[in-house]
Amino acid sequence: MVYYPELLVWVSQEPFPYKEMEGGLTKGRLPVPKEVNRKKMDEPIAASLIPPGNHEPGSPAIGYLHPF
């Protein structure tokens, strides 16, 4: 498993809004912070940090990437 600390997502422990609070959020989708959008744009750069063909001893090769 590969750990990328820059991809951490903070999840609130608060419950979903009650019916009387429904007007506080846009309908359909929750608002996405700008930082999350910026991280998605930076993702291809992070995927190219390891030069192709660089297989150090003890380092597993990554054969697939999962977009976040």
Curated annotation (Swiss-Prot):
It is found in: Cytoplasm. Phosphorylated on Ser-59. Phosphorylation decreases stability and activity. The keyword Protease does not apply. The keyword Phosphoprotein applies. GO terms for biological process: axon regeneration; regulation of neuron differentiation; regulation of transforming growth factor beta receptor signaling pathway. One of its GO terms (cellular component) is cytoplasm. Keywords: Cytoplasm, Phosphoprotein. Interacts with FLNA. Interacts with the latency-associated peptides (LAP) of TGFB1 and TGFB2; the interaction results in a decrease in TGFB autoinduction. May have roles in neural function. Ectopic expression promotes axonal regeneration. Also augments motility of gliomas. May also have roles in cellular differentiation. Induces differentiation of fibroblast into myofibroblast and myofibroblast ameboid migration. Increases retinoic-acid regulation of lipid-droplet biogenesis. Down-regulates the expression of TGFB1 and TGFB2 but not of TGFB3. May play a role in the regulation of alveolar generation. This is Neuronal regeneration-related protein. It comes from Rattus norvegicus. The lineage of its organism: Eukaryota, Metazoa, Chordata, Craniata, Vertebrata.
